[in-house]
UniProtKB/Swiss-Prot annotation:
Residue spans of biased composition, Basic residues class: 258-287
Family to which the UniProt record says this protein belongs: Belongs to the universal ribosomal protein uL2 family.
Protein name per Swiss-Prot or TrEMBL: Large ribosomal subunit protein uL2
Span list, region Disordered: 221-287
UniProt keywords, alphabetically: Ribonucleoprotein, Ribosomal protein, RNA-binding, rRNA-binding
Record-level GO cellular component terms: large ribosomal subunit
Role noted for this protein: One of the primary rRNA binding proteins. Required for association of the 30S and 50S subunits to form the 70S ribosome, for tRNA binding and peptide bond formation. It has been suggested to have peptidyltransferase activity; this is somewhat controversial. Makes several contacts with the 16S rRNA in the 70S ribosome.
SMART domains tied to this protein: Ribosomal_L2, Ribosomal_L2_C
Ribosomal protein found in the keyword field: yes
GO biological process, one term: translation
Species, as recorded: Prochlorococcus marinus subsp. pastoris (strain CCMP1986 / NIES-2087 / MED4)
Organism placement in taxonomy: Bacteria, Bacillati, Cyanobacteriota, Cyanophyceae, Synechococcales
Assembly with partners or alone: Part of the 50S ribosomal subunit. Forms a bridge to the 30S subunit in the 70S ribosome.
Length: 287
């Protein structure tokens, strides 16, 4: 997989950088594995906006992805690599020996015709799913379960991987992409290797319209609003916000405020917190 740059024929193509989609082999999704999904456009059940800057975009159908990998000790062949409009990672279509078809998150380097399997005692190969206790130290893994049998909940985005750092008692230590070191029970399943399509981080949309196609609406800076609309608003010209630090439209501290509860039971499983990104390197926008 590689990235594709465009010549500056138009303002939209001047900054545009996209993936070349060379790894995708299937043009149409598996009919039995797609369902319609209601798009709430950032609204809750009462129609009130709870997540701003959402709405519009191209119509999508949801692909049913197997995050549990619960077909144990049954060989599956990779039939195709498909595009998924709901995530940056690609999907691998598996044909199992018993005739069942399933989608999984495509690991980096997986090829059509390759065999994968899940279960205890399976070969240590990329794409195979097994308990964390069966993996050698230093392994890169993705699609990690937090609770055994619940399905993968961590390390699922394109190019992501966690590293198996240590095994001690009933737990193993994983270094997550955020650099946080967390304990996970050893019977939880994970998939060997990293998620494919890592070059997505080097892409650029190039124009506002492509962002609208993805269902993202414009973000208006609070400093250009009126005082009745945002705490940063008002003043003459480009006035400062008049506060010690930036706040949300509802007056709560933004950019750096910890949102994790101090008394959360799973805090004891976090060995080392993720590194804190400075405001300068974060490059965040005015809320």
């Amino acid at each position: 997989m590689a990235i594709r740059k465009f010549k500056p024929y138009t303002p939209g193509t001047r900054q545009r950088v996209v993936t070349d989609f060379s790894e995708i082999t299937g043009s149409k999704p598996e009919r039995s594995l797609i369902v319609s999904k209601h798009r709430n456009k950032g609204r809750n059940n009462r129609g009130v906006i709870t997540c701003r800057h959402r709405g519009g975009g191209h119509k999508r159908q949801y692909r049913l992805v197997d995050f549990r990998r619960d077909k144990k000790n049954i060989n599956a062949k990779v039939a195709a690599i498909h595009y998924d409009p709901h995530r940056n990672a690609r999907l691998a279509l598996l044909f199992y020996e018993d005739g069942e078809k399933r989608y999984i998150i495509a690991p980096a380097g997986i090829k059509v015709g390759q065999n994968v399997i899940s279960g205890e005692g399976v070969p240590i190969e990329e794409g195979n799913a097994m308990p964390l206790s069966s993996m050698p130290l230093g392994s890169n893994v993705h699609c990690v379960e937090l609770y055994a049998g619940r399905g993968a909940q961590m390390v699922r985005s394109a190019g992501a991987s966690a590293q198996l750092m240590a095994k001690e008692g009933e737990y193993v230590a994983l270094k997550l992409p955020s650099t946080e070191v967390r304990l996970v029970r050893k019977e939880c399943y994970a998939t060997l290797g990293e998620v494919g399509n890592s070059e997505i981080r080097n892409t650029s949309l190039g124009k506002a319209g492509r962002r609208r196609w993805l269902g993202r609406r414009p973000q208006v800076r609070g400093s250009v609003m009126n005082p009745c609309d945002h705490p940063h608003g008002g003043g003459e010209g480009k006035a400062p916000i008049g506060r010690a630090g930036p706040v949300t439209p509802w007056g709560k501290a933004a950019l750096g405020l910890k949102t994790r509860k101090k008394n959360k039971p799973s805090n004891k499983l976090v060995v080392r917190r993720r590194r804190r990104i400075s405001k300068r390197s974060r490059g965040g926008r005015d809320s």
